């Protein structure tokens, strides 16, 4: 039987999808290791007798005699020799439907699942029959693994525009719905109208009508249903000659659609659920809440009894995209709970746009990604001399001076998941166009200028010397470190340590007070270190980033303290949570915590000894946002005056800036700390009025200052 298998070459379970339990090649798709059936003998593979260049998918011929038969009733009325002649053909089609098909494609034996075969061979659409495309083969294989894996509730596919996922999902619904008994298969989309007209009436019903008679179960209702496709015995009037019903022959299975509400199928037991355009469900519907409710329709106790197809391009974050993004985050097959499931139960999958772009498939259905040496004939009969990647890059280059249009194009045809999850520029607090310019630049940098690691006391001796230790699992990300002579530099004034490099840089901290063992809300401690304008170090640059939540708050405090000591930078700390300030004071480092800068004090306010800065002041909130806004305009992305690229290398912070909402700041820890660092860098020292003491006499006074 197909299912989970142990394989010595793989650390995790391999999902074997062969109905006959043979073991063939293993593909890794979307982080899932999937084992295909073992390839059969050469002569059992379609198109084996053709030259490699002529080996490609083609629909198999259907006997003309069978095409004239419309129902099983007509079949039963045919002569026995007729049925004997064509029964092997019908049995072979059922075998292909169950076990899948092997065919030669340009000299390579290729396996397609039974559901994929049903799409290609038997599912006619308004544009005719589907072409074989390699990326869709992988989608079908991935879904077969989701169906086979007892830990999975289904597939989540983040896609580019026009990738054919609706056709694929409709084909799966019809294929499964015409085989199983007493089941319900459901459809929802971003609106009820979309579910009814664009999927059910334009896809599902025509595909079913195109099936040959031997795949069509008994159907109740009209030939063009609008609400449901019901495979049950039609109602009959009871007469003297008809006192019984043959309902046992019917499947009693239904494919239907429902309006877009969070609980549309609540209380139902679903066999397959297709959630179309799940990244575009807008309020009052919420795809997170809908999935929380409706996945229970696919589970009975601990058993998963149904599967889901969830696919979409992604709307702007405030129009359903953020909720979809959260489901995506929790659907990583490499992040499972103790029961072996992802948090959502789904397995996510992404295909870059350049592997799924219309017009860029050769006649064998393989994507033309890179530029070919010679023009290549496409599956449409045209010739192309560039690859899909170059084509899309050319389109991007043409829009580089229109940030809004460029951003929308990238969102619709993404190369990466991050691009697919991009937010719309409209209504954003900051210039997202420039932020994305920086993100794209950072992705192309090699080697990566950011090093991950931890700061620690040398040899474990506190308050002596801090060193940095690279560690892939570290909590700090560092893009620049001071030269040896500037590290751990401090000044003793009035018997207290003061940071020795405050003329070079500063830091900002968004803290928390409660240990994670008592506070599970997920807010992280965040810190940024920033170089001001100076000749001693790269200016106007964030040099270190921290975003973590150790189990104990004091671990976070010590992490920040050590970094501050190492760089010799003072910190501006949000003082609504005062625990970190007390910690610095208890360790003798209170002078490493800045007081509220003079230019951010409320006019007429009384001076206070409290260190840090409140985050609930509207003046501070506005100044904080303006500081980040100005920094992005001047130092992020391409500088419009010089043409130079910014040196902001921390992608987590860039992504945090993208989503930042000034009226809902709570969850944007990195935005808070980075803005505080920029406010600290703005600190202005007021010049004191000089007095004339020529006629005054004073005792001589000595000051003691020791520099280390």
Model region roles, listed by residue range:
Residues 150-173:
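Walker A/P-loop
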Residues 1-153, 202-207, 211-212, 224, ...:
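N-terminal accessory segments
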Residues 2-12, 16-23, 27-31, 232-254, ...:
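RNase H-like, metal-dependent nuclease domains and their acidic two-metal-ion catalytic environment used
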Residues 285-303:
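Short, conserved "post-DEAD/DEAH" coupling segment immediately C-terminal to helicase motif II
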Residues 176-183:
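Post-Walker A helix-loop "phosphate-sensing" segment adjacent to the P-loop in P-loop NTPases
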Residues 184-261, 309, 440, 444-452:
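Conserved nucleotide-state-sensing and coupling region of NTP-binding domains
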Residues 593-638:
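Short alpha-helix plus adjacent loop in nuclease-associated cores
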Residues 172, 198-207, 269, 289-294, ...:
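Alpha-helical scaffold elements adjacent to nucleotide-binding pockets in ATP/GTP-utilizing enzyme cores
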């Amino acid at each position: 039987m197909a299912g989970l298998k142990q394989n010595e070459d793989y650390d995790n379970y391999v999902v074997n999808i062969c109905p006959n339990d043979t073991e063939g090649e293993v593909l890794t798709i979307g982080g899932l290791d999937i084992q295909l059936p073992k390839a059969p003998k050469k002569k059992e593979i379609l198109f084996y007798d053709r030259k490699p260049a002529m080996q490609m998918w083609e629909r198999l011929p259907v006997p003309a005699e069978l095409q004239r038969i419309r129902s099983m009733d007509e079949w039963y009325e045919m002569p026995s020799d007729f049925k004997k002649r064509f029964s092997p053909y019908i049995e072979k089609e059922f075998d292909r439907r169950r076990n899948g098909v092997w065919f030669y494609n340009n000299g390579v034996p290729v396996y397609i699942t039974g559901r994929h075969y049903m799409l290609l061979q038997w599912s006619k659409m308004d544009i005719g029959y589907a072409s074989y495309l390699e990326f869709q083969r992988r989608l079908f294989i991935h879904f077969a693994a989701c169906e086979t894996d007892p830990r999975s509730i289904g597939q989540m596919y983040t896609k580019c525009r026009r990738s054919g996922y609706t056709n694929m999902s409709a084909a799966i619904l019809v294929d499964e719905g015409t085989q199983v008994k007493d089941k319900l298969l459901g459809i929802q989309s971003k609106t009820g109208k979309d579910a009814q007209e664009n999927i059910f009436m334009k896809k599902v019903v025509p595909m079913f009508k195109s099936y040959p008679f031997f795949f069509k179960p008994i159907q109740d209702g009209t030939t063009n249903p609008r609400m449901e496709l019901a495979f049950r015995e039609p109602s009959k009037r009871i007469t003297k000659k008809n006192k019984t019903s043959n309902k046992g022959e019917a499947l009693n299975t239904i494919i239907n659609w429902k309006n877009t509400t969070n609980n549309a199928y609540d209380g139902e037991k679903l066999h397959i659920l297709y959630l179309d355009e799940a990244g575009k469900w807008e309020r009052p519907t919420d795809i997170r809440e809908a999935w929380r409710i409706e996945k229970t329709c696919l589970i009975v106790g601990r058993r998963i009894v149904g599967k889901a197809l969830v696919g979409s391009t992604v709307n702007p974050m405030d129009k359903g995209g953020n909720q979809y993004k959260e489901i995506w985050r929790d659907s990583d097959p490499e992040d499972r709970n103790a029961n072996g499931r992802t948090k959502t139960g789904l397995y996510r999958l992404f295909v870059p746009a350049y592997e799924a772009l219309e017009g860029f498939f050769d006649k064998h259905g393989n994507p033309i990604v890179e530029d070919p040496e010679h023009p290549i004939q496409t599956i449409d009969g045209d010739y192309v001399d560039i690859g899909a990647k170059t084509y899309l890059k050319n389109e991007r280059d043409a829009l580089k001076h229109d940030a809004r249009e460029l951003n929308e194009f990238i969102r619709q045809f993404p190369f990466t998941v991050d691009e697919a999850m991009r937010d719309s520029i409209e209504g954003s607090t900051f210039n997202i166009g420039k932020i994305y310019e920086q993100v794209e630049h950072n992705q192309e940098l090699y080697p990566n200028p950011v090093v991950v690691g931890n700061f620690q006391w040398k040899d474990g001796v506190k308050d002596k010397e801090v060193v940095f230790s690279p560690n892939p699992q570290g909590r700090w990300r560092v893009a620049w470190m001071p030269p040896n002579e500037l590290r751990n530099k401090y000044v003793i004034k009035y018997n207290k340590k003061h940071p020795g490099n405050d003329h070079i840089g500063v830091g900002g901290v968004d803290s928390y007070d409660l240990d994670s063992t008592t506070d599970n809300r997920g807010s992280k401690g965040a810190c940024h270190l920033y170089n001001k304008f100076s000749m001693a170090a790269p200016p106007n640059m964030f040099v270190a980033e921290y975003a973590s939540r150790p189990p104990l708050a004091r671990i976070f405090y010590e992490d920040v303290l050590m970094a501050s000591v190492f760089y010799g930078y003072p910190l501006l700390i949000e003082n609504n949570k005062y625990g970190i300030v007390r910690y610095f004071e208890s360790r003798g480092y209170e002078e490493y915590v800045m007081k509220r800068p003079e230019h951010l004090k409320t006019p007429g306010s009384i001076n206070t000894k409290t260190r840090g800065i409140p985050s609930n002041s509207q003046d501070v909130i506005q100044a904080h946002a303006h500081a980040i806004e100005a920094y992005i305009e001047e130092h992020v992305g391409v500088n419009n005056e010089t043409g130079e690229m910014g040196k902001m290398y921390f992608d987590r912070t860039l992504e945090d800036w993208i989503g930042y909402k000034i009226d809902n700041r709570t969850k944007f820890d990195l935005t808070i700390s980075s803005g505080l660092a920029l406010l600290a860098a703005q600190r202005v020292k007021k010049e004191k009025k000089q007095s004339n003491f020529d006629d005054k006499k004073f005792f001589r006074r000595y000051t003691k200052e020791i520099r280390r």
